[in-house]
Design a protein with these regions (language model features):
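Bacterial N-terminal signal peptides
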Residues: 7-16
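N-terminal pre-domain segments of enzymes
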Residues: 25-63, 401
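Acidic Gly/Asp/Thr-rich repetitive segments characteristic of extracellular carbohydrate-active
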Residues: 47-94
Length: 501
């Protein structure tokens, strides 16, 4: 009887361990219970990573492909550099064995898609790009935990810190920090299945070197199903954001954009505007006028709508249609007057009051929808005030948030500014990176041993029952039915940087 009970118990234990997605474990009587081997899933229905949301949610990037390790901060294209890894073709995941500033010698362009850039894998303080724009011209791209702080040292007279506007699809940019552009910091339009989420977009350079003169713009946003959520835009003179509309496609029926849970601080001039053609949701965004905003008539505007001038591909007069709900204007900045606060409270009571029709080309009623547009999944929608706290806690390259982003978050929370420009800008608007002390130092740290260069540290592989001498197990589905073993490791580093349900 004892032998029978032991056999039943042993069988039950073996079946339990074999069905678990966890690591290989010692079995009763010695030996090892083999790892579970899940079949490769259909990635078209699996989020890019836990926390991915919006139109680009199901981007697969380089999942299951080669692992390329960046070991050098040089930008000469040699093996081991970021440019070398980006130029490669085929599915690939780019991980980092170094931290610091990469001083780009020319624009960094992704021409070959099916790629994941996992900035969170960098040891120490992480990666920061300098001098030139980071441009995406490919399909199926995931970029996470990268900083692009361009500056004006390279004398680029009208460049963005990061952009993608070449009619591509399946792109998600997550937890990145963008600043010090000479044009816009973050410009993304005319792409489909696109998400920009959990990013800090701050301090574009105003009186710098743009060929048209003063700039300092946040970004141009849009897309044929695009989502922009949980981003912080801070300290820009304008374009927070400009909505591109269907100016270049001539297809307003295809322009569909979701903007939710964004935080916009210390904006100026027109603030958010344009949208010449398309359908737009503005849901639960948090507007916080700062000292610069208090000097502008835009302090009480959620959006200023434009009609198309007919100079590109739209018919003249085309305009967007907008749905507003749950957006909140924070009246706590000490620079605001009582009258300004009263105006803002009217917008909080009725968001449609915050829509301005430029030139009065049509009655406001023609621009308003009474129900939200069905655009993309929106599983992380929060009330505006909760989103404010979440964005300040988690946005940007926050695996190790640098001193620059810490300052921006602090200013946003307190409704203050710390610096003025060296060429005439003021109230938190800057002209050169040196106005705020320049680039922070990004220290590296000891790189965990990774004998097979598969992106997973040896110690982590052993802990999870993988083989630190077998590079092929990075692409296996042993620890999860949805994500490769490498993805489980990379996601595990940063899963805490999203609101916990």
């Amino acid at each position: 009887m004892k032998n029978v009970l032991f056999s039943i118990s042993f069988l039950a234990l073996t079946m339990s361990l074999a069905s678990s997605p966890m690591s290989a474990l010692p079995a009763v009587g010695g030996g090892v219970v083999p790892l579970k081997e899940y079949p490769a899933p259909d990635r078209s229905h699996i989020p890019a990573f836990p926390g991915a949301d919006g139109a680009g949610k199901y981007t697969s990037g380089g999942a299951g492909g080669k692992v390329l390790v960046v070991r050098s901060l040089k930008d000469d294209g040699s093996e081991g550099t970021l440019r070398w890894a980006i130029r490669k073709k085929g599915p690939r995941t780019i991980v980092f064995a170094v931290s610091g500033i990469i001083e780009l010698t020319e624009p960094l362009k992704i021409h070959n898609g099916d790629v994941t850039i996992a900035g969170q894998t960098a040891p120490g303080d992480g990666i920061c790009l300098k001098n030139y724009t980071f441009n995406i011209q490919a399909d199926n791209v995931i970029v996470r935990f990268i900083r692009s702080r361009m500056g004006a040292d390279a004398k680029r007279k009208g460049d963005d810190a990061m952009n993608a506007f070449q009619n591509h699809r399946n792109i998600i940019i997550d937890h990145c920090s963008m600043s010090w552009s000479t044009d816009e910091c973050a410009t993304f339009y005319d792409n489909s299945n696109f998400t920009l989420q959990w990013c800090i977009i701050s301090e574009s350079l105003a009186n710098s070197i743009h060929e048209k003169g003063a700039h300092g713009y946040g970004g141009i946003w849009g897309g044929q199903t695009a989502s922009f959520h949980h981003n912080l835009l801070a300290n820009h003179t304008n374009r927070t954001p400009r909505l591109c509309g269907s100016r270049y496609t001539g297809k307003p029926e295809e322009e569909k954009v979701d903007l939710f849970n964004n935080v916009i601080y210390n904006y100026g001039s027109a603030g958010a505007y344009a949208g010449e053609g398309g359908s737009y949701n503005f849901l639960n965004n948090y507007y916080k006028p700062g000292p610069f905003t208090a000097t502008k008539s835009s302090y009480k505007r959620l959006f200023t709508a434009y009609a198309d001038d007919g100079k590109n591909n739209n018919v003249k007069g085309v305009h967007g249609v907008f749905y507003f709900n749950g957006n909140y204007m924070d009246p706590t900045c000490s620079s605001l007057t009582d009258k300004q606060r009263q105006d803002m409270m009217k917008v909080n009571k009725d968001n449609t009051v915050g829509l301005v029709v430029s030139g009065k080309f049509a009655p406001k009623s023609e621009l308003l929808s009474d129900k939200p547009f069905e655009i993309a999944e929106r599983s992380t929608l929060q009330p505006a005030w909760d989103a404010f706290e979440s964005v300040l806690a988690y946005a940007g390259a926050s695996y190790r948030r640098d001193s620059y982003d810490c300052r921006i978050v602090d200013e946003t929370r307190k409704g203050i500014y710390s610096y003025t420009g060296s060429h005439g800008s003021s109230l938190g608007i800057i002209d050169q990176p040196s106005d705020v002390g320049g680039w922070p130092e990004y220290k590296t740290a000891e790189v965990p041993a990774d004998s097979d260069a598969d992106g997973m540290p040896d110690a982590w592989e052993k802990e999870h029952g993988l083989d630190p001498e077998d590079a092929s197990d990075s692409a296996g589905y042993n620890l999860s039915a949805e994500y490769t073993n490498l993805e489980v490791y990379m996601n595990g580093l940063v899963n805490h940087l999203y609101p916990q349900k």
